[in-house]
Amino acid sequence: MLANHDTAAQLLSVIIETGEGGLIVVDGGWTNNTDYVLNQIKQKGGHVQAWLLTHPDSDHVGALADILYKHNGEITIDGIYYSFAEDSWYAEKDPEVAKMVAYIKGAFGLVPQNILHGDIVSGQVIQAGPARIQVLNQAYKMNNDFVNNSSVAYMVSLNGTNTVFLGDLAKSGGEQLMADHDLSALKCDIVQVAHHGQNGVGYEVYKALRPSVALWPTPQWLWDNDNGGGSGSGIWLTQETKNWMVRLGVNANYCIKDGDQVIE
């Protein structure tokens, strides 16, 4: 899980090595993270078997867009997987995100169309070498926190370990995910805490997943709930999520405030 080496902003950027020379990438970060992400992929062999997108916020899909615009052909991508709502929905709900949707769709036009899989559905299984990826939902259209709640959740199973990525799912999206799946049956080992560790899914989602390890795509200021006035000065709910992880007995927390996080 990559930290933001370019700004202090939050992001979600994960590279999974499948062990057979291939990679799975989850989101990737901002446009200004492009060079770092690209170099990390190249250092790991340059072959992305599956690039998974949770939702089209700039801090998640910007880097992929600019890799396709500015570095097309420098790495191999076998498949890009995503579920977006209609352009008109983003235009109505969040014009800034609508701009990013248009931007990344423009980038999609530069690659072979057979690698684009924008039609993923709940329950679909994607094979990436020895890794098995389960799509847990299509983009939800909730009546609040619209774009975050449209996040696709994925479970990546590799070497006997199940990792659930929640993207930026918020409370109602998490409730819908619980309605759609028996989350306890997923046998989750590792969870990416939703929405950078605050104001994401509710406690019941984590309780059902019962992870032993938590991945925090959370910069220092957000971890500390620091709006510039010191620890605890902000309005973010990070401490609540930390408390949940303690209640659930999570025994390891990996956070990008400490730099790139490697789990082997």
Identify the function of each model-found stretch.
Residues M1-G46, Q113-A185, V262-E264:
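Core dinuclear metal-dependent hydrolase active-site scaffold
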Residues A9-Q10, T31-N33, P56-G62, E86-Y90, ...:
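Active-site environment of divalent metal-dependent phosphoester hydrolases
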Residues G19-G22, T31-Y82, H181-Q198, R210-L215:
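Active-site metal-binding motif and surrounding structural segment of the metallo-beta-lactamase
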Residues V26-W30, V48-L53, D87-D94, Y140, ...:
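Second-shell loop/turn segments in exported
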Residues D27, L166, V193-A194, P217:
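Thr-Gly-centered strand-to-loop micro-motif
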Residues V37-N39, L64-D66, D94, L177-A179, ...:
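Short amphipathic alpha-helical segments
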Residues E74-N148, V213, T218-E264:
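Binuclear metal-ion centers of metallo-dependent hydrolases, dominated by the metallo-beta-lactamase
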Residues K207-A208, R247:
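Solvent-exposed polar/charged
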